[in-house]
């Protein structure tokens, strides 16, 4: 039977914050079916593809997405019906050209992405392949090392913590399932530690982490490391720390305003702030350590810490190949966060990952703070062998859904599932270390290629 697109239909559903989002169904002539739901961010980069919302305050406080849904059911459906779902590049190119804008503001990135992902899922169903294997069909796959957001602050929580995410990284294990077990044990132990120290854990943040008021940002790290030890693990051996300060959120008039500590820091002082932490704690990754507009500062940050820790650009690069290219040229950061809805199509996401891999940058596949039960990013992380994933804490079913999908994939792959551990975090070393870099070529559709570099 034919793999041509027969039907495209969108609806408005709710995300994990109770806000409207777009869900799309695609049916092929063969009867194969694909569905995808689109996530949404809280702290968003200024150069992200545009998420189209209606702005009618009488409906969902202005956050409804009926126009995006209408765009899928009319303009986009008419444009892609009859196209071959196995040709992902053509599907995405058709929608990009139909939109005609640089940031997908006319049709909405949420409309376009929903169709892009649902089509890919339908194509996988047509070929009777698991989604990750449809994206890349090889013998062995890298299971991603999870960054688990156990303390939430900033825009993700209603507390006094300036920095947005304090994450545990269970990299000192042989399998993903062992790492996940460690993460859950540390997460539950952290609750006991926070309560014992007099902090409230009555609620959790958008991504499922605890959201206590703390005397300082550093207190979050201290509490986490205490929990790691009390759970029976060794910091720097079994469990490491990753940070996402989301610095654009507290960057005001050229200064970094840490209100919880009553500090107003220059770029150089902010870099020194991080450098002291890197020397003191087992930190392996810092995401958005400086503001997205502070490119000169990013250059200084990379020069000072780029050979010691992974420096991830999220708001900085917004999964955009053209912006990433500028960063690579200027020697800024050494890693990129991959968020599908920042760029709006699967094809462009692959292009960004390919560019990053060819430049020696790592890729971290990521969720958004406004998530759904959709598990596509779990399959994407495995398919591209990115080696890293951010999908929240060990609570809230929208986060757990991704971890459970990774457990299923690891079980299915058996001995062909490789957990890279600390080797997933690639950055230059002061020591002369011989590195073996494996290039995995991912064939997507007829022409798409993703190159992912993995240190062995």
From Swiss-Prot:
GO biological process: glycolytic process
Active site positions: 207, 339
Gene3D superfamilies in the cross-refs: Enolase-like C-terminal domain (3.20.20.120), Enolase-like, N-terminal domain (3.30.390.10)
Compartments in which it is found: Cytoplasm; Secreted; Cell surface
GO molecular function terms listed in the Swiss-Prot or TrEMBL record: magnesium ion binding; phosphopyruvate hydratase activity
UniProt entry keywords in alphabetical sequence: Cytoplasm, Glycolysis, Lyase, Magnesium, Metal-binding, Secreted
Residues that bind Mg(2+): 244, 287, 314
Involved pathway(s): Carbohydrate degradation; glycolysis; pyruvate from D-glyceraldehyde 3-phosphate: step 4/5
GO CC terms in record: cell surface; extracellular region; phosphopyruvate hydratase complex
The UniProt record lists the keyword Cell membrane: no
Names of the cofactor(s): Mg(2+)
Cofactor binding description: Binds a second Mg(2+) ion via substrate during catalysis.
Pfam families in the cross-refs: Enolase_C, Enolase_N
Residues where (2R)-2-phosphoglycerate binds: 164, 339, 368-369, 390
Alphabetized SUPFAM superfamilies for the sequence: Enolase C-terminal domain-like, Enolase N-terminal domain-like
EC number(s) on file: 4.2.1.11
Superkingdom assignment: Bacteria
PANTHER family: ENOLASE
Role: Catalyzes the reversible conversion of 2-phosphoglycerate (2-PG) into phosphoenolpyruvate (PEP). It is essential for the degradation of carbohydrates via glycolysis.
Family recorded in the similarity comment: Belongs to the enolase family.
Protein name as catalogued: Enolase
Gene: eno
